């Protein structure tokens, strides 16, 4: 069992943040992000995914933990160190935009249903 708050990279190079304890096989790599703030971990996971999920890995050529050493990920930095506060701010902003879009979508669906119902 692996600890929650870590990131996995599967055999295809797809990275996922895990906020729960989980099990895995030898086709996943675990990146230890548990000591980072949650939203910074989500940002780091997205950066890993962008670098690793490129189509290079498939059933014939799996991603393994050793491949993680070859990844180049780009993170915002401040004074030569990762800027985790900025990462958290960016992910928080993206989450708010997604929530706003979902609410607007739901409002449009409700309005359309009401319009159809009034015609019945």
Model-derived features: positions:
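DNA target-recognition domains and sequence-specific DNA-contacting regions of bacterial/archaeal
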Residues: 1-72
């Amino acid at each position: 069992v692996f600890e929650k708050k870590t990131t996995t990279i599967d055999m295809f190079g797809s990275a996922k943040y895990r906020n729960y304890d989980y099990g895995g096989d030898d086709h996943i790599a675990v990146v230890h992000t548990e000591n980072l703030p949650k939203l910074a971990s989500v940002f780091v996971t997205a950066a890993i995914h962008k670098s690793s999920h490129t189509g290079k890995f498939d059933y014939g050529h799996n991603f393994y933990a050793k491949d993680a050493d070859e990844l180049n990920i780009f993170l915002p930095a401040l004074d030569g160190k990762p800027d985790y506060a900025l990462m958290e701010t960016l992910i928080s902003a993206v989450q708010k935009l997604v929530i706003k879009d979902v609410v607007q979508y739901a409002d449009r669906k409700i309005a359309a249903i009401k319009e159809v119902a009034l015609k019945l």
